Amino acid sequence: MENVESFTYLGSIIDEQGGSDADVKARIGKARTAFLQLKNIWNSKQLSTNIKVRIFNTNVKAVLLYGAETWRTTTTTIKKVQVFINSCLRKILNIHRPDTISNSLLWERTNQLSAEEEIRKRRWKWIGHTLRKSSNCITRQALTWNPEGKRKRGRPKNTLRRIIEADMKTMNYNWTELERIAQDRVGWRMLVSGLCSFTRSNRRK
């Protein structure tokens, strides 16, 4: 079997370091192509902004965030995704330099969550779906698996597991408690909404 540094699986790029940079870059490229192909939609005088944003969400943003629930996100990757989204939204609203608009007002006018919050929401929706699966499910076992042994010295890499565990610490829940809550879909949605609201308010401080 050939040893490769990265490969594509189910539309996502997997690299040997477990990072998501290559996949995020590819997703932005595909989303940009999708956005440019719909240029006539964005320039249309007959379509309302609301309809344009809905088309953006289903035809561009869906391409951009495909598989985002399992991304190993960093401040840099989040920023790249957000910059692309903001650029698209400004073009849809026909806002060009020297005209300016704050990000918060831009998101409010287009009914958007920040990229960070959107990805966190998708991630925890996926976690809830996974925790409702059979205990024999490999995906569920991998998600809740607790690796043993000592880690290497130095600053630990920012992995998907550490990102999830940081959110768990914020909510003050362990896997056993989350597995119980996940069985109640309404309760799970409330938990995810509360987490996103908490992180949003902290970001504004």
Please place each PLM-identified region on the residue numbering:
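Short linear motifs embedded in intrinsically disordered, charge-biased segments
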Residues: 1-205
